[in-house]
Design a protein with these regions (language model features):
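Cytosolic regulatory modules rich in charged/polar residues
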Residues: 1-256, 366-394
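Hydrophobic alpha-helical transmembrane segments of membrane transport and translocation systems
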Residues: 305-307, 311-397
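Transmembrane alpha-helix detector for multi-pass membrane proteins
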Residues: 218-234, 249-324, 329-330, 335-341
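Glycine-centered flexibility sites
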Residues: 27, 63, 67, 86, ...
Length: 397
């Protein structure tokens, strides 16, 4: 009956009632015909979707300006368009009991680490949650378990750029696509993977290397610039030996540590407010935020100009790296260092640095080698490839 009368590509027969009900919930159409003991399941679903457009984050000056959207089929097509090889595998999975989310593992058969792939499959199969309404984040947390909640460092990289996801697949990584999400999840993820981004590969190798080195310097400055400056200006004698430019010229009544913490919270408040501000009021909000954080705060003797200058640098530097999660991890560590320095001076800074190193060493990725790979365990070739943008050759992407 199906072969003779139903002229549709996506159709199959089903006898199991439970499977039929599940398919209907997933959007398929069930055709029941009297006299036949099978049901024809026709995949004619079409969900509302926005068009393919450039993502708001991770923009590039050159290169493709398309991005993933909330439709899984379209995202898979964007990858297939770039990798026209039979080795590209798109492996489908179902996750959660209620939402029955579609998850696709994208990898190259001839490049993927089989042990790594089996580990990802096992973790997906063990996900025991009723719903994954937050898409990738829910899946990532379920795969991590509850043992790593205390570490702020991100264990997953996200990208909304098909070209970046394609490059990761070509290098042997696994890209996880989730329906209803415009971001791809890249596994495995290590700390030094955040050093590189798409712009590095759209410029010559020398410029790409410079951008990576600049990003590493920004990582360090974002975490240490305000704690080290606070440590130096706590004692006026420390800023007399050639460091006079770091000293505070104006008088202040609010303790310096309180000023730094207050500035950190004000910056976060402005970020949160900007997310919920309608576009019509965005210009007014920018002017109000600049006045409150700048002129009024100084005139009211809440903050000294030096605190504003360093916090402005930190706020700008946070946007120089591609991961929001990593930016907030640096922020929490920076607050910890400020409190340690305020309480224990030089000893506090040393203890804070030791604590950060121990935290990095104790952090475990979802799958793969250690979080500090390729530094620990040391892989000189992989470390060099991360720090230096090599020219394109036959063996790399």
């Amino acid at each position: 009956f199906i072969d003779r009368y139903i002229t549709f590509n996506e159709v199959n027969a089903e006898q199991n009632v439970k499977n039929t009900v599940t398919s209907v919930f997933l959007g398929k159409m069930a055709l029941l015909v009297e006299g036949y003991d099978e049901c024809a399941l026709i995949d004619a679903k079409q969900y509302p979707a926005r068009g393919v457009e450039e993502p708001s984050s991770g923009k590039v000056l050159r290169g493709a300006h398309d991005g993933f959207i909330e439709t899984l089929v379209a995202n898979a097509a964007l990858l297939r368009r770039r990798i026209r090889a039979p080795q590209l595998t798109l492996e489908g999975h179902k996750v959660s009991d209620c939402s029955r989310a579609d998850v696709v593992l994208c990898y190259l058969e001839n490049k993927v680490d089989r042990k790594l792939l089996d580990e990802v499959r096992q973790k997906l199969a063990k996900i025991d949650v009723r719903s994954v309404s937050m898409s990738q984040e829910s899946i990532a947390e379920a795969m991590m378990g509850k043992k790593q909640w205390w570490t702020p460092f991100p264990k997953v990289r996200y990208t909304e750029r098909p070209d970046a996801a394609t490059a990761c697949v070509m290098e042997g990584d696994i890209v996880v696509l989730v329906d209803n999400s415009p971001a791809a999840m890249i596994l495995p993820t290590h700390f030094f993977d955040f050093v590189q981004e798409a712009n590095d590969f759209y410029f010559p190798p020398l410029i790409g290397t410079y951008l990576r080195i600049l990003r590493i310097v920004v990582f360090l400055l974002t975490m240490f610039i305000t704690p080290v400056w606070f440590l130096l200006v706590k004692d006026p004698a420390r800023t007399q030996a050639g460091l006079e430019f770091l000293a505070i010229d104006s008088d202040y009544s609010v303790p310096l540590l309180v000023q730094l913490l207050l500035a950190e919270f004000i910056v976060d408040l402005l970020k949160l407010a900007s997310l919920n501000t309608p576009d019509v009021f965005s210009n007014s909000f920018s002017m109000l935020g600049a006045l409150v954080l700048g002129d009024f705060a100084v005139q009211a003797h809440w903050l000294v100009p030096e605190v504003l200058a360093y916090m402005a640098f930190v706020a700008i530097a946070n946007f120089a790296q591609p991961s929001y999660e990593l930016g907030y991890a640096f922020k929490l560590l920076r607050l910890m260092l400020l409190l340690f320095v305020g309480a224990l001076d030089w000893v506090g800074l040393a203890l804070g640095c030791i604590g950060i190193i121990a935290l990095l060493a104790a952090t475990k990725p979802i799958v793969g080698k250690g979080y500090l790979y390729p530094l620990c365990p040391l892989d000189k070739k992989a470390l060099f490839a991360l720090l230096v943008r090599k020219p394109i050759s036959r063996d790399n992407t």
